[in-house]
From Swiss-Prot:
Name this polypeptide is given: MLO-like protein 13
Membrane association type: Multi-pass membrane protein
Domain of life: Eukaryota
Keywords attached to this entry: Calmodulin-binding, Membrane, Pathogenesis-related protein, Plant defense, Transmembrane, Transmembrane helix
Polar residues biased stretches: 464-478
Region of interest (Disordered), ranges: 449-478
Stretches assigned to the Cytoplasmic side: 32-60, 167-276, 319-360, 422-478
Region Calmodulin-binding, residue ranges: 435-456
Compartment(s) of residence: Membrane
Length: 478
């Protein structure tokens, strides 16, 4: 009792208490001010999508704060929950020694188990007097607390790095956009210049159709799927594909504005999607709970689960590549029927006619991959490399290799593919308007609602218009 009292706040030097409190408050204020200034910087640069993503990140930090508070406040109550020994004598992450597992449950062993489960300084008398053991120890709660924090941090880091690397990959397509916009359309341009550019454009379109629909064997569904699967590993997007899909988007949504900056539009939509990807949805937390439940020693759950993000990523990449091939095959069939041979974007190309499913799958893939790496580092620094939870080296190395492969493939292939191919849906995305136009439309809608305008007109403004070219969508250009 004397040792317990000497370790309490009552018998801790005041300078120690003040110093620790000062450090914690200082670090918290620095983090808060840093996020505040980052938000102001994004606002000044009119990066509204990234600013919204930052706000979403703050919400996730607030959720972590609530989880931390709940674990801290309920710690005393949880450690006094007593259960029969048989209830906590199975489904361990590590296999218990046989002699311990089959030992009779005497009152002496119950007390020893209680002392083992509780951290130093706790009294097992509360449960031992009932012939029971604590449900969970304070040490286990503390380690779970750290794991949740590490998981959230790794998820944010992985999502941010994926978006940055994917955005850098998309930025490499800028010269294709510049090439298309520099076509000789102004008055005074020589006829030779017109013919030269038209020939280059024809060559690019011809290359696109020959690549995906040339020859009988390319029209086979099986061959097309196999080719799409392997193409995601090399040259996932070519110049001819970019130009063909860009033309399809312009003809469907911006027919009267051929100089629309499609490349900038893609980057804006990617920034908007980042806000969704950086969050941890309820079903992702449910996935964590299920994994913690099934992480039983001998089941190798961690190893088998590491295949899931890789399999899903390969499926998504192959599907996106197959959509490009399907667009080319559709045009080829139209030519054979003497119809207008133009690429027609459609939601029917995507799973369940919903392009948004692709983003949800990428969200889950990134979270699952960050979960794998976060769990590895948490075990490494908490229990050490030789922990039984870490499993054998033969299981460990493949997991790490697959984690790195998923991160690289998603950043440099799948995410850029997603940014381009999902524009081939029936509707365009919110990012088609620049920040100024978007704010103006939202303000107009809000004023209309406040004035009590008819519901049909407000609904018409809310819906995506079919002629965005009537707005000054390029006002961001200097």
């Amino acid at each position: 009792m004397a040792e317990a009292r000497s370790g309490s706040l009552e018998y801790t030097p005041t300078w120690v208490v003040a110093f620790i409190c000062f450090i914690i408050v200082l670090l918290s204020l620095l983090a808060e001010r840093g996020l505040h200034h980052l938000g102001k910087c994004l606002k000044r640069r009119q990066q509204d999508a990234l600013f919204e993503a930052l706000q979403k990140l703050k919400e996730e930090l607030m959720l972590l704060g609530f989880i931390s508070l709940m674990l801290t406040v309920s710690q005393a109550a949880i450690r006094h929950i007593c259960v029969p020994p048989a209830l906590v004598n199975n489904m361990f992450p590590c296999k218990k020694p046989l002699e311990e597992h089959h030992a009779p449950k005497s009152s002496h062993s119950i007390i020893n188990n209680a002392r083992h489960l509780l951290s130093t300084g706790e009294s097992p008398d509360h449960c031992a007097a009932k012939g029971q053991v604590p449900l969970v120890s304070v040490e286990a709660l503390h380690q779970l607390h750290i794991f949740i924090f590490v998981l959230a941090v790794f998820h944010v880091i992985f999502c941010a790095s994926t978006m940055v690397l994917g955005g850098a990959r998309i930025q490499q397509w800028k010269h294709w956009e510049d090439w298309f916009k520099k076509r000789p359309s102004q008055k005074g341009t020589t006829r030779r210049g017109h013919h030269a550019h038209a020939h280059e454009l024809f060559s690019a379109n011809h290359e696109f159709f020959e690549m995906h629909a040339g020859g009988f064997w390319r029209r086979s569904v099986v061959i097309s799927w196999v080719r799409s699967f392997f193409k995601q590993f090399y040259g996932s997007v070519t110049k001819s594909e970019y130009i063909a899909l860009r033309q399809a988007f312009i003809m469907s949504h911006c027919r009267t504005n051929p100089s629309f900056d499609f490349h900038k539009y893609m980057l804006r939509t990617l920034e908007i999607d980042f806000k969704k990807v950086v969050s941890i949805s309820w079903y992702l937390w449910l996935f964590v709970v299920v994994f913690l439940l099934l992480n039983v020693g001998g089941w190798n759950t961690y190893f088998w689960l590491s295949f899931l993000p890789l399999i899903l990523l390969l499926m998504v990449g192959a599907k996106l590549e197959y959509i490009i091939s399907s667009l080319a095959l559709d045009v080829s069939e139209k030519r054979s029927r003497a119809e207008e041979a133009v690429i027609t974007p459609s939601d029917e190309l995507f799973w369940f006619h919903r392009p948004g499913i692709v983003l949800q799958l990428i969200h889950f893939i990134l979270f699952q991959n960050s979960f794998e790496i976060a769990f590895f580092f948490w075990i490494l620094f908490t229990y050490g490399i030789h922990s039984c939870i870490m499993e054998k080296l033969g299981y460990l190395i493949p997991r790490l290799v697959m984690g790195v492969l998923v991160q690289v493939l998603c950043s440099y292939s799948t995410l850029p593919l997603y940014a381009l191919v999902t524009q081939m849906g029936s509707k365009f995305k919110k990012g088609i308007f620049d920040n100024v136009v978007q704010s103006t439309l939202e303000g107009w809608l809000e004023d209309t609602r406040n004035r009590g305008e008819s519901t049909s007109e407000a609904h018409r403004i809310e819906m995506q218009p079919t002629t965005p070219e009537s707005y000054n969508v390029q006002s961001e250009n200097p």
